[in-house]
Each structure stands twice: as structure tokens, then as C-alpha cells.
From Swiss-Prot:
GO terms for biological process: isopentenyl diphosphate biosynthetic process, methylerythritol 4-phosphate pathway. It comes from Vibrio vulnificus (strain CMCP6). This is 2-C-methyl-D-erythritol 4-phosphate cytidylyltransferase. It comes from the Bacteria. The gene is ispD. InterPro entries: IspD, IspD/TarI, IspD/TarI_cytidylyltransf_bact, ISPD_synthase_CS, Nucleotide-diphossugar_trans. Keywords: Isoprene biosynthesis, Nucleotidyltransferase, Transferase. Catalyzes the formation of 4-diphosphocytidyl-2-C-methyl-D-erythritol from CTP and 2-C-methyl-D-erythritol 4-phosphate (MEP). Belongs to the IspD/TarI cytidylyltransferase family. IspD subfamily. The record marks 160, 216 as: Positions MEP for the nucleophilic attack.
Length: 237
């Protein structure tokens, strides 16, 4: 691990409702092995030796977070989340900018990715330590990709050779990411992840290949897969 990045802050946007899960609560509060997905995710981040603090952005009217044991953890800070992901990340970044000891770099990680491997975080930190902009974890596209027309029929096959699935964490300089998100939102630009804000400014974030097990729990069937990956890791310990 690069010596210049021995202390990092992770930002977790967790204000989404996860409607595609069709559950009685936001997906980050569904349980696996007696813990919520959010707890698994945050504990995975905080157990990494380079991450010293996690700032989690939660909806102000969220009734679940305060009931979690992690809500009282001294290295986990709750801030108000926003309507969109970018608003939540920006809220966390603005909180960090007001602290006496400001974070130079931040790792932004999805609340519903509880299976991220420490070795992938190591690789991301190592790559970003020598990259001007920062970078993201990603996996190369393996399947044949089709572009559809308006009638949901195949228009043409897309060349997959240069296509990657964007994952998280995504790691950038805190000040640069703050400016990029602020400017993009002010211009009405659609921001689906942090890298897209940097791309809009003409930056070229690095792609760091990560494990395909770093899934995002989005659909009901993803819950069983995340449980499998977490169980497999537990058995290895």
C-alpha cells in the first residue's frame, strides 16, 4: 500500500429506497446472517487498515439506522442524505470539508455491496496513489452485449472489448470530487456514479479490475448470492 495513503475516509450513500427489491424496507436494511446489508458493508470498510472513518449518508426520516449497533460507533458518522445518490455523496463531502483534519482522498462505496474484498481495496489504493485523477473498481464485460431499439428488439451487437462494469469503491481526491459533483448538479447533468462526474469534466479515471463477487444487492435473487459469498468467506476464516 502506498505510504501517501495510509489513512482514508469512506463515504457510503445509504438514502435509497431500493424499490426493485419489493421488500418492506430499503434493501440496505435487509438481513444476512443476523446483520443488515449496511452493517456488513460498513464493517467490511472499517476493518480495512487504511480506512479510519466511514461517513454514511442516510435519509433524515430514516427509522432504521438509529436502531443499528453501528450507529453508536465512534468512527462512523451519519449525515443527511439527499434525493439522489450524488446529493448524498455531496452531503458527506461537505461534512468532511468542515473538519479540522480534512480528508485528501475518499472512497465512495455502495451501501448494498457487502462483499467487497480487501485485496480489491488494496489494488484500488495502490493504483490511485500514482494516478492524477483517481479510479474505480470494475470488471470487464464477458457477455455478448446487445443494444435495443424502442420496441425492445435487438438493434445491433455492441463490441464488448472495451466495455467494463463499474463497481465501487470509487476513489478520488475529496476536493476534486466535491467540485465535480457540485458543478455537474448545477448544470443538470445526470450523475449515476462518482466517475461520471469526473468524466463530465474531461478527466480520465483509472479502471482497476476487481472481483466479480463484489455484487450490488438490487434484485431479490441477489440476496441469496450475497449470502453465499459472505458464508464462503466466513468458512475460510
Amino acid at each position: 500500500m502506498a505510504r501517501s495513503m495510509t489513512s482514508l475516509v469512506a463515504v457510503v450513500p445509504a438514502a435509497g429506497v431500493g424499490s426493485r427489491m419489493k421488500a418492506d424496507r430499503p434493501k440496505q436494511y435487509l438481513q444476512i446472517h443476523g446483520k443488515t446489508i449496511l452493517e456488513h458493508t460498513i464493517e467490511r470498510l472499517l476493518s480495512h487498515p487504511a480506512i479510519t472513518q466511514v461517513v454514511v449518508a442516510v435519509s433524515e426520516d430514516d427509522p432504521y439506522y438509529s436502531e443499528l449497533a453501528i450507529a453508536q460507533h465512534p468512527d462512523i458518522v451519519r449525515v443527511a442524505g439527499g434525493k439522489e445518490r450524488a446529493d448524498s455523496v455531496l452531503s458527506a463531502l461537505r461534512f468532511l470539508s468542515l473538519q479540522q483534519q480534512k480528508a485528501d482522498w475518499v472512497l465512495v462505496h455502495d451501501a448494498a455491496r457487502p462483499c467487497v474484498a480487501h485485496q480489491d481495496i488494496d489494488a484500488l489504493i495502490e493504483r490511485c496513489s500514482s494516478h492524477e485523477t483517481g479510479g474505480i473498481l470494475a470488471t470487464p464485460v464477458r457477455d455478448t452485449m446487445k443494444r435495443a431499439n424502442a420496441q425492445q428488439m435487438i438493434d445491433h451487437t455492441v463490441d464488448r472489448n472495451a466495455l467494463w462494469h463499474a463497481l465501487t469503491p470509487q476513489m478520488f481526491k475529496a476536493e476534486v470530487l466535491t467540485d465535480a459533483l457540485s458543478d455537474a448538479l448545477a448544470q443538470g447533468v445526470a450523475i449515476t456514479d462518482e466517475a461520471s462526474a469526473l468524466e463530465w469534466r474531461g478527466e480520465l479515471p483509472a479502471l482497476v479490475q476487481g472481483c466479480s463477487s463484489n455484487i450490488k444487492v438490487t434484485q431479490p435473487e441477489d440476496l441469496a448470492l450475497a449470502e453465499f459469498y459472505l458464508s464462503r468467506e466466513k468458512d475460510r476464516k
